[in-house]
């Protein structure tokens, strides 16, 4: 178990690195609403939803998951997804962490297991509720997140692959990398954070696949962003995350299809393993890589 002192230090460090939370939800043409009756919520995760005025028929859904020290309303204010939803007509779900530090549980057995009763279970139930409530297209559900939210994005893609068509990961770690052998909820794993959990694509794939035993259906395509000078979640985590999804999709991690310099912008390098996996490494960028909303829209198929 982390001591209270260490937890305080970790929270203080993260607070200094992440965006401040807006005092009030930004005014947009739609409105952010809190939903409390979306179904089973075993860990008390908050649900906020943005439904655009320009709601499409059979709309898509984007689940946007905040960083440590964040909240659902904070990520609504500090990201582009609500504005983009007015352009493309999709619904945005903003989960909100139930923990005092604002991080996500990506460490307990419950959250790392399909229908295990952890944070991932609560977020999955938000998705199924929204599909039912708004007649959303179940084939157009996407997940994205920054830092701790990026970690949870990988966890959601591993634990509920049937729910998502694609994901974008902004400065996270592999699904299962923060696993706590003491089953700690919302635990910090310095070994993983510092890039010292290194293994093979096959092993990483087995970790992800074990989160939903027996599942053999489709899995979301993944786009992984990370910065070269990240000192919170070290750059090695980029390579390990790409290994994991290369292993899941059966790509040869050591032989990508192509590498494109200065893509999608100067000092960013995009590596493509196949239709289902891209890695984007940002030279000179720390924690976290800024959200590339337009590129997300392309990856999700809205643009």
Swiss-Prot record:
Keywords recorded for this protein, A-Z? Carbohydrate metabolism, Cellulose degradation, Glycoprotein, Hydrolase, Polysaccharide degradation, Secreted, Serine esterase, Signal
GO cellular component: a single term: extracellular region
Note whether Transferase occurs among the keywords.
no
- Where's the active site on this chain? 147 (charge relay system)
Q: Which residues form the signal peptide?
A: 1-23
Single Gene Ontology BP annotation: xylan catabolic process
Q: What is this protein called?
A: Probable acetylxylan esterase A
Q: Which organism is it from?
A: Aspergillus niger (strain ATCC MYA-4892 / CBS 513.88 / FGSC A1513)
């Amino acid at each position: 178990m982390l001591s209270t002192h260490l937890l305080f230090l970790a929270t203080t460090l993260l607070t200094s690195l992440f965006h401040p939370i807006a005092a009030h939800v930004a005014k947009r043409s739609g409105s952010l609403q809190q939903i409390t009756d979306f179904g089973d919520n075993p860990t008390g995760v908050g649900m906020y939803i943005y439904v655009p005025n320009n709601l499409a028929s059979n709309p898509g859904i984007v689940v946007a998951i905040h960083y440590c020290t964040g909240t659902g309303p904070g990520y609504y204010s500090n990201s582009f997804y609500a504005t983009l939803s007015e352009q493309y007509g999709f619904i945005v779900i903003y989960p909100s962490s139930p923990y005092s530090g604002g991080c996500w549980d990506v460490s307990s057995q419950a959250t790392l297991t399909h229908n295990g009763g952890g944070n991932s279970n609560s977020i999955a139930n938000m998705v199924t509720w929204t599909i039912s409530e708004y007649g959303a297209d179940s084939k157009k559900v996407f997940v994205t997140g920054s830092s701790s939210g990026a970690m949870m994005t990988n966890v959601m893609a591993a634990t509920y692959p049937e729910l998502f068509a694609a994901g974008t990961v902004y400065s996270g770690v592999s699904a299962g990398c923060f696993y706590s052998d003491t089953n700690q909820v919302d635990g910090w794993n310095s070994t993983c954070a510092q890039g010292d959990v290194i293994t093979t694509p096959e092993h990483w794939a087995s970790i992800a696949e074990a989160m939903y035993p027996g599942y053999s259906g489709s899995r979301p395509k993944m786009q992984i962003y990370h910065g070269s000078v990240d000192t919170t979640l070290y750059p090695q985590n980029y390579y390990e995350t790409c290994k994991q999804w290369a292993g899941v999709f059966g790509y040869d991690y050591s032989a990508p299809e192509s590498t494109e310099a200065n893509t999608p912008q100067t000092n960013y390098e995009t590596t493509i393993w196949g239709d289902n996996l891209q890695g984007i490494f940002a030279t000179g960028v720390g924690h976290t890589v800024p959200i590339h909303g337009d590129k997300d829209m392309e990856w999700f198929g809205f643009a």
